[in-house]
Swiss-Prot record:
The RuvA-RuvB-RuvC complex processes Holliday junction (HJ) DNA during genetic recombination and DNA repair. Endonuclease that resolves HJ intermediates. Cleaves cruciform DNA by making single-stranded nicks across the HJ at symmetrical positions within the homologous arms, yielding a 5'-phosphate and a 3'-hydroxyl group; requires a central core of homology in the junction. The consensus cleavage sequence is 5'-(A/T)TT(C/G)-3'. Cleavage occurs on the 3'-side of the TT dinucleotide at the point of strand exchange. Pfam families: RuvC. Its EC number is 3.1.21.10. Homodimer which binds Holliday junction (HJ) DNA. The HJ becomes 2-fold symmetrical on binding to RuvC with unstacked arms; it has a different conformation from HJ DNA in complex with RuvA. In the full resolvosome a probable DNA-RuvA(4)-RuvB(12)-RuvC(2) complex forms which resolves the HJ. Belongs to the RuvC family. The active site is at 9, 74, 146. The gene is ruvC. One of its GO terms (cellular component) is cytoplasm. Its main location: cytoplasm. One of its GO terms (biological process) is DNA repair. InterPro entries: RNaseH-like_sf, RNaseH_sf, X-over_junc_endoDNase_Mg_BS, X-over_junc_endoDNase_RuvC. The lineage of its organism: Bacteria, Pseudomonadati, Pseudomonadota, Betaproteobacteria, Nitrosomonadales. It catalyses: Endonucleolytic cleavage at a junction such as a reciprocal single-stranded crossover between two homologous DNA duplexes (Holliday junction). It comes from Methylobacillus flagellatus (strain ATCC 51484 / DSM 6875 / VKM B-1610 / KT). This is Crossover junction endodeoxyribonuclease RuvC. Keywords: Cytoplasm, DNA damage, DNA recombination, DNA repair, DNA-binding, Endonuclease, Hydrolase, Magnesium, Metal-binding, Nuclease.
């Protein structure tokens, strides 16, 4: 059975999305990108409600274009700055709203769970996540950081959040808790 998974890495300025297809234990890249709510110069577009609408509308368009059957989104972590955490939570809420409005089932994973599933340890650096996403999906180059995180979230969901043990049965070699 083949189905598509939409992974989302929520952010108020940049929201990453990634769509993969799962057929049995095999994963295939479909699409990825970044939703930007800033101008090219890093300044904010309009006000907060407008930025949230951009996230909601853009994800609705992604869903219409790629027709995923399931979605996975990264959970919010509590930042040192409470204001940043609240803003991230609002961006995440806009993303979840887009998924709910389209009737998609949603799975939520912490960044630690996603990294553990894709890289083999929960405290992996961004470049390690990018490299593993590239390898697991046979991409020609490294995906951008926000897209890589979203694709990693989708990969985590595809493997049931079970980590490298599941990957080992899919034909990848695991040694010392790491994919080789």
């Amino acid at each position: 059975m083949t189905f598509r998974i939409l992974g989302i890495d929520p952010g108020l300025r940049l929201t990453g999305f990634g769509v993969i297809e799962k057929t049995g234990e095999k994963l295939a890249y479909v699409a990825s990108g970044t939703i930007k709510t800033t101008t090219g110069k890093g300044s904010e577009i309009e006000d907060l409600p407008t930025r949230l609408k951009i996230i909601l509308d853009s994800l609705a368009e992604v869903i219409d274009n790629y027709q995923p059957q399931q979605a996975a989104i990264e959970k919010v972590f509590v930042n040192v700055n409470p204001q940043s955490t609240l803003l991230l939570g609002q961006a995440r809420g806009a993303a979840i709203s887009a998924l709910v409005l389209q009737g998609l089932p949603i799975a939520e994973y912490t960044a630690l769970q996603v990294k553990q599933s894709v890289v083999g340890h929960g405290h992996a650096a961004k470049d390690q996540v990018q490299e593993m996403v590239k390898r697991l999906l046979n991409l020609p180059g490294l995906p951008r950081p926000d897209s890589a995180d979203a694709l990693a979230c989708a990969i985590c969901h595809a493997h049931g959040g079970q980590g490298l043990g599941k990957l080992a049965t899919a034909g990848f070699r695991v040694k010392g808790g790491r994919l080789i």
